């Protein structure tokens, strides 16, 4: 029992370390494309959801969300007001920065668990979890921007 807890703790530490490396190594986690930043930070969150389950994916997703909030605060671009309440003055920015990222790990974990539970093809479960996690990030962030900051974002 003790070895399993240690293994889980080490996996959490590794995923958090990977997230932090992606955040702080230039052009690796955040890729500047004009005034926007594409991200690869959702990839470890999806993998954590698959390996550690929905709870683990949500925890690593929280790290992604908090790092997004932090990074957009210390290194702002034209659109950083959407992800940082310190720039926009609205706590709703924190919701856009954190909630979709937490849900990436949740969705990836739930879908993979369902594939394993029903004894379906595990490789298909990994692929579909990855696709759904990536789409969840994109759709939920864009929906948050549209519904909360639609007018302001259009002007930026």
Task: Label every model-predicted segment.
Residues 1-156:
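Loop-helix junctions at membrane interfaces
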